[in-house]
Amino acid sequence: MTSKPNFLIIMVDQLNGTFFPDGPADWLHTPNLRRLASNSVRFKNAYTASPLCAPGRASFMSGQLPSQNGVYDNAAEFSSTIPTYAHHLRRAGYQTCLSGKMHFVGPDQLHGFEERLTTDIYPADFGWTPDYSKPDERIDWWYHNLGSVTGAGIGEISNQLEYDDEVAFNAKS
């Protein structure tokens, strides 16, 4: 009997592809990512169907454009009736697990995955949809400029540290 290959899908937000011509750029200190990339199959000509995170993830998971799956912004529900690669992997006998943010809107927070190791950093909801008739109340002040980077200062906690703590807490022996 032939064993199935294991694989790990890593999806990141807002990462410029020029950082990875043949692995992480030399000036980036990413020893673990560099080691992982050197022993992996990588998609060098990947394409995202949307520059927004939730529609991009829904398209990647479903193989459908936002116009087909209805996830056109970060507040749109990703219908549980749409099969994802996780459904297909489970049908092929794989064990599936999700960790990290997905911003799934709606009751289905797994979309074919058997388990989820971490909660979402902030579930998407209709509050993510800006009201363009009220520009002073929009949430995009932190999303479309470098203010959150240049004004950040020294951090005491990060989403990564919170995820690491949660994974350690929920680790199965």
Regions found by a protein language model. Name each.
Residues 1-173:
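Formylglycine-dependent sulfatase
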